[in-house]
C-alpha cells in the first residue's frame, strides 16, 4: 500500500483540450503538459474549450470535478 504522502495531488484549473471515448484530455493553466484521458465525475459532459477544475495523479489517474466561467 502506498503511503499517503505518495498519493497526494492538488485541485487544478485547466481547459478541455480533447474529448475522447475514454475521457477528456485537459490542459492545465499552470504547467506544460496535457493529461491522459480522465473521466468527468457524475457523467457530466463537457465541450472542448471549457474551463474545468480537475485533479490528476502522477500515475495518470484523475477526474474532472466541475466547470467554471
What are these regions (language model features)?
Residues 1-69:
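Exposed beta-strand/loop interface patches that mediate assembly or binding
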Amino acid at each position: 500500500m502506498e503511503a499517503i504522502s505518495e498519493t497526494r495531488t492538488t485541485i487544478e484549473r485547466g481547459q478541455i483540450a480533447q474529448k475522447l471515448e475514454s475521457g477528456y484530455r485537459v490542459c492545465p493553466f499552470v504547467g506544460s503538459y496535457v493529461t491522459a484521458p480522465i473521466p468527468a465525475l457524475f457523467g457530466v459532459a463537457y465541450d472542448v474549450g471549457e474551463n474545468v477544475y480537475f485533479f490528476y495523479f502522477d500515475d495518470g489517474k484523475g477526474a474532472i470535478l466541475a466547470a467554471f466561467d
